[in-house]
From Swiss-Prot:
The keyword Ubl conjugation does not apply. Phosphate binds at residues 21, 25, 44, 88-91. The record marks 218 as: Important for catalytic activity. The gene is deoD. Keywords: Glycosyltransferase, Transferase. This is Purine nucleoside phosphorylase DeoD-type. One of its GO terms (cellular component) is cytosol. Pfam families: PNP_UDP_1 (PF01048). A purine D-ribonucleoside binds at residues 5, 180-182, 204-205. It comes from Buchnera aphidicola subsp. Acyrthosiphon pisum (strain APS) (Acyrthosiphon pisum symbiotic bacterium). The lineage of its organism: Bacteria, Pseudomonadati, Pseudomonadota, Gammaproteobacteria, Enterobacterales.
Length: 234
């Protein structure tokens, strides 16, 4: 059943969807890792593909930038297409000195400056957390693959350009491992609709050190993260 944002049939998607923010990255993942894949959505250029990874049916779909976009697509995938497991595979910023560019970080939970989870939780704080089984599994797989990962809490912000030094100091004080624009929203939707979700990101920007990867590097240099996510759902 198509929606205003996803022009696909009911069975076009796997029950497992990996979600990068960038549609170009979704296309890259499908072409590099999936066999017998087909494009199942191009509405609003939010590209989606379904194919097979080691005989497991997998879908890849971009979610765009920010909580509103990511929440919209995850909600429609869950309600209209029976998706049961979502892994965000994206980029994030870092503030801690021990976290470097290209490090892989996994979000146990995510606080946010958005009001989205307060809206759904009667204006109270909501603990937006990942699914435990997914965390346990991906950490186990990372050890087998000898891929270093760091685990901690994210801060999901509505503002990409923010030079608030006071806030940066707070993020460091509370040991925030990654700063992104989607995770808290995805975890909120997943919790409300009773499905599994996990956010795994590669550090593309170090906010306090003012280091960053180029747009070209962001497109295709995150293979370890992608392979880790794919292996974790077999």
């Amino acid at each position: 059943m198509s929606t205003p944002h996803i022009n696909s049939k009911k069975d076009d998607f796997s029950d497992i969807v990996l979600m990068p923010g960038d549609p170009v990255r979704a296309k890259y993942i499908a072409e590099k890792y999936l066999s017998n894949f087909v494009q199942v959505n191009d509405t609003r250029l939010m590209l989606a593909y379904t194919g097979f990874y080691k005989n497991r049916k997998i879908s890849i779909m971009s979610h765009g930038i920010g909580i509103p976009s990511a929440s919209l697509y995850t909600r429609e995938l869950i309600i209209e297409f029976n998706v049961k497991k979502i892994i965000r595979i994206g980029t994030c910023g870092a503030v801690r000195d021990d976290i470097k560019l290209r490090d892989i970080v996994i979000s146990m939970g995510a606080s946010t400056d958005s009001k989205v989870n307060r809206i759904r939780f009667n204006d109270h704080d909501f603990a937006a957390i990942a699914d435990f089984d997914m965390i346990y599994n991906i950490v186990s797989i990372s050890k087998k693959m000898k891929i270093k990962v760091s685990i901690g809490n994210f801060f999901t912000t509505d503002s990409f350009y923010n030079d608030d030094k006071k806030m940066l100091n707070i993020l460091k004080k509370y040991n925030i491992i990654g700063v992104d624009m989607e995770t808290a929203g995805i975890y909120g939707v997943a919790s409300e609709l009773k499905v599994q979700a996990l956010s795994i990101c590669t550090v593309s920007d170090h906010i306090t050190n003012k280091e960053f990867l180029s747009s070209k590097e962001r497109e295709s240099s995150f293979n370890d993260m992608i392979e880790l996510a794919l292996e974790s759902v077999l």
